[in-house]
């Protein structure tokens, strides 16, 4: 079949047979070509972007999670996750179903507003089909209220459990990502491209390196064969030592939670052990081209990394 006629804005470069089928996560990375329009001065901005990309090739790109991790219209996914970690299930449900955002269309906005006012059936009736997950949760609450005359914590838990497993898992994962971004931001102030004693280091296969060779660590860091990590917080994730470890501990303390909180005792299936994630990623095959109204930026980055992290470094130069 002609895939390009079926898949719009997709270009098929090559098709090959393989003895093993492809699985999620097996890609090496992604190549991007992004147009930044309405820049101040395309000629100067091209030079600025090239300088930024050359610098990032040396230091690595801060491994921030992109805004899409938290919800593009309503950035609430991580807030729901925080409520689950804190054990406030009612607040988690209220945050997901209610809490309207001014960027939403009128119908979803009004439906969420009705929920916040306690008008559950009216809210349900007004919700469009696109809000199927909110409707699924709300249906549980309405049935419970009709049956028992009130909504208990168990009912709110059932409302959460009515969601598909990937979505349920996303809440706490998004909160972990939010906290990780805080770690990256703080660690960037003291350097993400150098080894600090006490760092927990991973190699290119994302495996922990338990023995650090002081004679070669700087060269390994420069080659990106080794990278420092930060915590995706969880009940079993270890902290680094030294100043960077103090940063990691302070960030979670400021949230008024502990590692144990990530066991999510009221919704244990949604708990997380946590892992360590690289604080930076390698960027390759970069180029910048001037256009009539801006610049085109091209680059290749590993899987699991966000192009928005690269754009963040370019755009903060006020191009």
List where the protein language model places each region.
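ATP-binding Walker
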Residues: 305
């Amino acid at each position: 079949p002609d895939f390009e006629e079926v898949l719009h804005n997709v270009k098929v470069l090559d098709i090959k047979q393989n003895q093993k089928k492809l699985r999620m996560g097996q890609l090496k990375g992604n190549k991007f070509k992004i147009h930044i329009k309405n820049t101040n001065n395309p000629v100067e901005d091209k030079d600025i972007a090239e300088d930024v990309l050359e610098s990032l090739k040396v230091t690595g790109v801060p491994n921030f999670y992109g805004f899409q991790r938290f919800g593009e219209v309503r950035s609430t996914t991580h807030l729901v996750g925080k409520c689950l970690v804190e054990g406030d299930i009612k607040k988690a449900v209220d945050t997901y179903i209610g809490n309207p955002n001014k960027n939403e269309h009128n119908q979803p906005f009004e439906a969420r507003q009705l929920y916040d006012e306690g008008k559950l059936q009216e809210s349900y009736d007004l919700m469009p089909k696109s809000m199927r997950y909110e409707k699924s949760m709300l249906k549980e609450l309405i049935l419970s209220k009709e049956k028992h005359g009130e909504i208990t914590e168990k009912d709110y838990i059932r409302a959460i459990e009515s969601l598909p497993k990937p979505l349920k898992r996303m809440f706490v994962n998004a909160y972990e990502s939010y906290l990780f971004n805080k770690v990256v931001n703080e660690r960037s102030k003291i350097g993400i491209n150098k080894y600090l004693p006490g760092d927990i280091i991973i190699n290119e296969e994302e495996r922990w390196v338990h023995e650090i060779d002081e004679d070669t660590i700087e060269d390994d860091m420069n080659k990106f064969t080794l990278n420092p990590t930060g915590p995706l917080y969880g009940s079993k994730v270890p902290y680094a030592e030294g100043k960077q470890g103090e940063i990691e501990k302070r960030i979670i303390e400021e949230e008024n939670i502990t590692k144990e909180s990530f066991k999510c005792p009221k919704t244990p299936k949604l708990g997380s052990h946590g892992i360590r994630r690289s604080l930076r990623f390698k960027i390759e095959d970069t180029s910048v081209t001037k256009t009539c109204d801006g610049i085109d930026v091209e680059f290749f980055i590993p899987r699991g990394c966000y192009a928005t992290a690269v754009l963040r470094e370019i755009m903060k130069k006020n191009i």
